[in-house]
A protein has these predicted regions:
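Short, linear, compositionally biased motifs with a strong N-terminal bias
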Residues: 20-21
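Residues that recognize and position ribonucleotide moieties
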Residues: 218
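Cell wall/extracellular polymer interaction/catalysis modules
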Residues: 28-215, 224-270
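Conserved "landmark" site that anchors the functional core of diverse proteins
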Residues: 221
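C-terminal motif of bacterial Sec signal peptides marking the signal peptidase cleavage site
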Residues: 24-25
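Bacterial N-terminal signal peptides that target proteins for export
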Residues: 2-15
Length: 270
């Protein structure tokens, strides 16, 4: 996740602690770890059949007056990483099972993540999220050894040398033959501390096609993305959750996730 706009400092602090504990080799995970997303009022949930599935289903939820999750709108198909999913670095505690997201592995990060800034090709967008219209000089740095790793930068500010080796121009329509996948989207705040080689530049964005997976992002129909951006509000502290079905069933109670998405990810609606 690029670091140009992160969620509240309290969330970043807890996420940092989780990363440092993992890097220190901590083997003990509390039975009921802190949930920095407990105050989230909006939640985007993506469930996939298993760790290797490259497509799944997206649902949106908001809390009612009683604090319960209620689905908003309809379920939509999505594509994720070409190699499936792997645990990412987000708001959730480290998990003992399953693959781990690494730079260039083609997996989408699994877990609970803050939703960051929206972006797109146009100067403005119909969203309450902070929004940045991208220019030809904007890149997301996916070079693990760069001091700008996992950040969206402007070459007019950092210089051309700073983006050497990056494969993530934010104006794909200009640099990649008219590609519309980044026409509109938002940042999924994976790896906020920019741990080298842990994965970078994770977005929710428009898909190339319903059957074309991504390098690690979550992609969907443009109309679905537009509805999401029109609905999301920064004051609701929205979060993005991606889990394989088995892990969702296991964690939805302990993690206080919506409880009515079970069993719906196996039908291929592409």
């Amino acid at each position: 996740m690029p670091a140009f706009n992160s969620i509240a400092g309290r969330i970043r602090h807890v996420a940092c602690i989780a990363v440092l504990l993992a890097l220190a080799g901590c083997a003990h995970v509390p039975a009921n770890p802190p949930q920095p997303w407990r105050d989230a009022g909006q939640l985007v949930l993506v469930t996939v059949a298993d760790w290797n599935a490259d497509h799944g289903q997206l649902r949106s939820f908001e809390r009612d007056d009683a604090g319960q999750w209620v689905q908003v709108g309809t379920t939509a198909p999505v594509v994720i990483g070409r190699a499936g999913a792997g645990w990412g670095l987000g708001l959730h505690p480290m998990q003992p099972d399953g693959p781990t997201k690494q730079e260039g592995d083609g997996r989408a990060p699994a877990g609970v993540f803050a939703i960051g800034q929206a972006f797109g090709y146009a100067p403005h967008a119909a969203t309450a999220l902070p929004y940045t219209g991208m220019d030809a000089g904007d890149y997301c740095i996916d070079v693990s050894t760069s001091p700008l790793y996992n950040r969206i930068v402007d070459t007019a500010v950092v210089g051309e040398a700073a983006i050497e080796g990056s494969t993530e121009p934010m104006r794909r329509d200009i640099h990649a033959g008219g590609d519309q996948r980044y026409r509109i989207g938002f940042v999924v705040e994976h790896n906020p501390q920019a741990v080298p080689a842990a994965g970078s530049c994770i977005f929710a964005h428009v898909w190339k096609s319903p059957t074309t997976p991504t390098a690690g992002c979550t992609a969907m129909d443009a109309a679905v993305m537009e509805r999401l951006l029109a609905w999301l509000r920064p004051d609701a502290d929205p979060v993005f959750v991606l889990l394989p079905q088995a892990q969702y069933l296991q964690l939805r109670g302990p993690w206080a996730l919506p409880g009515d998405a079970a069993g719906a990810t196996h039908a291929d609606s592409r």
